[in-house]
A protein has these predicted regions:
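Membrane-embedded catalytic cores of phosphoryl/pyrophosphoryl-handling enzymes
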Residues: 47-134
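Terminal transmembrane helix and immediately flanking juxtamembrane interfaces
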Residues: 1-36, 50, 105-134
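Membrane-helix interface/capping segments
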Residues: 35-47
Length: 134
């Protein structure tokens, strides 16, 4: 995100600031939801499911990686729509990887996608581009 200010000047700085603020909000929301739901991870609850990498925390719901990737992508695409092929592919791979690695249930990833989309949309509604750039 820091590169945006160098590449796109003031506009890039504003985009990076909005992405950072949205990301921080996503992190806080993710932590609250994890503590509230306390859903065990698939590799702990389902025999035969193997965690291929160690988890960053104890609980499964929602997928923090997916929530961050989706909220970032929603905001980034509003600023830089030409990056859609790259960002949408990246975000889809993040979501799929969480299930493939045995760290999340598909519902964790789906819920994180919905929450991240809503959070990104809320960020764009509260801080619309035409107001920020004007």
């Amino acid at each position: 995100m820091a590169v945006l200010a160098l590449v796109d000047g003031r506009r890039g700085l504003l985009a990076a600031a909005q992405m950072a603020l949205t990301g921080l909000t996503a992190l806080l929301l993710y932590r609250l939801l994890k503590r509230w739901t306390r859903r065990p991870r698939p590799f702990r609850a389902c025999p035969g499911v193997i965690a291929h990498v160690p988890p960053l925390d104890e609980f499964s719901f929602p997928s923090g990686h997916t929530l961050q990737a989706v909220s970032f992508t929603v905001v980034a695409l509003a600023w830089y729509p030409l990056l859609a092929p790259l960002l949408l592919t990246f975000t889809a791979l993040v979501g799929a990887s969480r299930v493939i690695l045995g760290l999340h249930y598909p519902s964790d990833v789906i819920a994180a996608t919905v929450i991240g989309s809503a959070l990104g949309a809320l960020s764009l509604w509260l801080l619309p581009l035409h107001v920020l750039v004007a």
